[in-house]
């Protein structure tokens, strides 16, 4: 998918870019796979903001995606490649030979008319899903499960990929996009290939309004607030932070503090951290 560059007809259009959507084959989604999506605007059930900078945006329908890929041995044909407003990756509508329709994450190189299949005996082809233990070393994969049968949780964003490095007993070593090397059960499934729409990260939003269309509200710096609103606020002119280290709006340390639980059970499955050389 290419990048479309706009002429600077207005200040908002200057330097603005967008995807050309050349891979998209239809703009009409499969109605049976849509569910309504309520805009929470970052509020919880008490009406209080629990996630800042969310609200507004264009109304969306949620597309039901098959992350489990557990219809073993049943072939499916790719019918369309579609845009999904709820994720950075594109999605593909597939029709199984038994009549079932499903959406999957569209990997790079997947084309309309291509046949895909899931199961331990599936070929190592783009779009096929099989257990990690059955995938050869060096293969690039995405949509990786962390628990067998739960559905893919890792490597689902546009352009993301992971690589199978080897096998140790019942575990398979996988190098993630961040550089982290992790042990995952060999019975967990993954899909062969890289997630498509890899140029999505190169798009220049161009103007504030495009972020608002996505439901993203402005982020105000703490240093321009009053001291009763933020620890960085107050002072005369452009005042420094005034504390030992930067803080969140609630006084907790920010920028660099590790937030992962040191006693997490999955720590033993991480062979190499993402920031280790």
Curated annotation (Swiss-Prot):
Give the top-rank taxon of the lineage listed in the UniProt record for this protein: Bacteria
Q: Where is the composition biased (Basic residues)?
A: 259-277
KW Ribonucleoprotein (keyword) present:
yes
GO terms (BP aspect): cytoplasmic translation
The answer to whether the entry has keyword rRNA-binding is: yes
Q: Which Pfam families match?
A: Ribosomal_L2, Ribosomal_L2_C
Q: Which GO terms describe its cellular component?
A: large ribosomal subunit
Single GO MF annotation: transferase activity
| Gene3D superfamilies to which the protein is assigned, alphabetical | 2.30.30.30, Nucleic acid-binding proteins (2.40.50.140), Ribosomal protein L2, domain 3 (4.10.950.10)
Q: Which UniProt keywords apply?
A: Ribonucleoprotein, Ribosomal protein, RNA-binding, rRNA-binding
Give the span(s) annotated as Disordered.
219-277
UniProt lists the family membership as follows: Belongs to the universal ribosomal protein uL2 family.
What function does this protein fulfil?
One of the primary rRNA binding proteins. Required for association of the 30S and 50S subunits to form the 70S ribosome, for tRNA binding and peptide bond formation. It has been suggested to have peptidyltransferase activity; this is somewhat controversial. Makes several contacts with the 16S rRNA in the 70S ribosome.
State whether it acts alone or in a complex, and with which partners, per the record: Part of the 50S ribosomal subunit. Forms a bridge to the 30S subunit in the 70S ribosome.
Question: What PANTHER family does this protein map onto?
Answer: LARGE RIBOSOMAL SUBUNIT PROTEIN UL2M (PTHR13691:SF5), RIBOSOMAL PROTEIN L2 (PTHR13691)
**What is the name listed in the Swiss-Prot or TrEMBL entry for this protein?**
Large ribosomal subunit protein uL2
What taxonomic ancestry is recorded? Answer: Bacteria, Bacillati, Bacillota, Bacilli, Lactobacillales
- What is the gene called? rplB
């Amino acid at each position: 998918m290419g990048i479309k560059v706009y002429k600077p007809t207005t200040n908002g259009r200057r330097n603005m870019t967008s995807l050309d959507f050349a891979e998209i084959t239809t703009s009409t989604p499969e109605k049976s796979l849509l569910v309504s999506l309520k805009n929470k605007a970052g509020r919880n059930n008490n009406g209080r903001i629990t996630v800042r900078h969310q609200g507004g945006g264009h109304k969306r329908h949620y597309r039901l995606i098959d992350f489990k890929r557990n219809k073993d041995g049943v072939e499916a044909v790719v019918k369309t490649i579609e845009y999904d407003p709820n994720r950075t990756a594109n999605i593909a509508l597939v029709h199984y030979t038994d009549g079932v329709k499903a959406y999957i994450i569209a990997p790079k190189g997947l084309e309309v008319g291509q046949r895909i299949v899931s199961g331990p005996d599936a070929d190592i082809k783009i779009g096929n899903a099989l257990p990690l233990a059955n995938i050869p070393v060096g293969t690039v994969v995405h949509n990786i499960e962390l628990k067998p049968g739960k559905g893919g949780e890792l490597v689902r964003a546009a352009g993301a990929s992971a690589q199978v490095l080897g096998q140790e007993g019942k575990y398979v070593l996988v190098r993630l996009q961040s550089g982290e090397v992790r042990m995952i059960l060999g019975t967990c499934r993954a899909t062969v290939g890289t997630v498509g729409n890899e140029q999505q990260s190169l798009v220049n939003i161009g103007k504030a309004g495009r972020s608002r269309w996505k439901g993203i509200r402005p982020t105000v710096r703490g240093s321009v607030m009053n001291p009763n609103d933020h620890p960085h606020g107050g002072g005369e002119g452009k005042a420094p932070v005034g504390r030992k280290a930067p803080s969140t709006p609630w006084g907790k340390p920010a920028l660099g503090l590790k937030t992962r639980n040191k006693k997490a059970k999955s720590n033993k499955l991480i062979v190499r951290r993402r920031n280790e050389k």
